[in-house]
Curated annotation (Swiss-Prot):
The keyword Transmembrane applies. GO terms for cellular component: plasma membrane. It comes from Bacillus subtilis (strain 168). Keywords: Cell membrane, Membrane, Transmembrane, Transmembrane helix. This is Uncharacterized membrane protein YkvI. InterPro entries: YkvI. It is a multi-pass membrane protein. The chain crosses the membrane at residues 6-26, 37-57, 90-110, 114-134, 140-160, 182-202, 217-237, 262-282, 289-309, 317-337. It is found in: Cell membrane. It comes from the Bacteria. The lineage of its organism: Bacteria, Bacillati, Bacillota, Bacilli, Bacillales.
Length: 347
């Protein structure tokens, strides 16, 4: 990315890697936002996938046209100076909360799947994150390009094995949800992830050579996200008592595709790790704009705060924080829908 303009495939992989974090890769987000509505949740996945493709493209095109260097400039463009600054403060707390969720997810991974202390998992993640952030953002894009294809391949393997070897089909049923709750949940999921992804997508758009590349990258990325979401949904629908697990997808892999269990756990950790690093980068840039302190102190303060918050527990954080963030993010999606993209800059 740094040596030349990015390609559509690079953009797509980073897009997927930005959206796919602890909740997505472990299956908790799929359970909370989609599977609990039965097969109506599958239609919700298609709605979210459409949002990732269309609104993701619009977000990045606007960013390129206004030459936004950070999501703060994007929010000021969408909401105006006063409201934009308020939204930016809100985003500061959102990114901090999501970082706590990612840390808690790492702890749950070590505890539930490896039999180790959750505290060890969180501290290892914190240590690795701080080490990487001393080198800047050079490795962020490379990690996504490496991890995302593996995630897609293993998702396909797991969904195939789970349907071959499982006798359960009870997790997803034709249950009639209350009114349009499944649709609101799907839109909320898309809004949440798009509003968070702007921390990476907004500056990334200026790494692309043209709007054509952006549109193609958004299409590929949105399609890949829809495929991975669908595969995870179908796999989880075969797991008995799916709602009892903090990391249900890892349980599916363990039961029906045991040969790739440890590799999939590594992929989950990779997604958690890249999400933590991305959030750290976005938070540090925002804090630096109003508090000129050395980066290492900001990183340390962020991780200490996130570590304390993560003690609430991964499952509880996902169930309460994510839906709340999603509903508030609807304002961001509404502004993105209503705001007209500025004219293309003349060459």
């Amino acid at each position: 990315m740094e040596q030349s303009k990015g390609s559509a495939s690079q953009l797509a992989f980073v897009y997927v890697g930005t959206v796919v974090g602890a909740g997505f890769a472990t299956g908790r987000e799929i359970v909370e936002f989609f599977l609990k509505f039965g097969w109506f949740g599958f239609f919700g996945i298609l709605v979210s996938g459409g949002m990732f493709t269309l609104l993701g493209a619009k977000l990045m095109i606007i960013s390129k046209r206004i030459n936004a260097k950070s999501y703060q400039e994007m929010n000021i463009f969408l909401f105006g100076a006063t409201a934009g600054r308020i939204i930016n403060v809100f985003m500061l707390f959102v990114l901090l909360g999501v970082t706590s969720v990612m840390l808690s997810g790492a702890g749950a991974l070590f505890e539930e799947q490896l039999g180790m202390s959750a505290q060890i998992g969180m501290l290892i993640t914190i240590g690795l994150s701080l080490i990487v952030m001393t080198r800047g953002v050079k490795g962020i894009f490379g990690v996504n390009v490496f991890v995302v294809p593996l995630l897609i391949i293993f998702s396909m393997i797991v969904v195939a094995d789970s349907f071959i070897f499982s006798e359960s089909r009870n997790a997803a049923q034709w249950v009639w949800p209350h009114r349009w709750d499944w649709l609101l949940s799907a839109v909320s999921y898309g809004a949440l992830n798009l509003s968070l992804a702007q921390a990476v997508l907004v500056p990334l758009a200026n790494e692309m050579s043209s709007e054509k590349v952006i549109k193609k990258g958004a299409l590929i990325g949105g399609t890949m996200l829809t495929i991975v979401l669908s595969a995870s949904f179908l796999s989880l629908s075969t797991l008995p008592d799916v709602f009892l697990y903090d990391i249900p997808m890892a349980q599916v892999v363990y039961l029906f595709a045991r040969s790739v269990h440890l590799i999939y756990l590594l992929i989950i950790f990779g997604e958690v790790f890249t999400s933590v690093i991305g959030n750290l980068y976005g938070l540090e840039k925002q804090v630096q704009s109003f508090l000129p302190v050395k980066s290492k102190y900001i990183f340390a303060a962020i991780m200490i705060t996130a570590y304390i918050t993560s003690q609430i527990g991964y499952g509880r954080l996902i169930s309460t924080i994510y839906p709340l963030f999603g509903y508030v993010s609807l304002a961001f999606i509404g502004a993105l829908l209503c705001k007209k993209a500025p004219r293309r800059r003349s060459l």
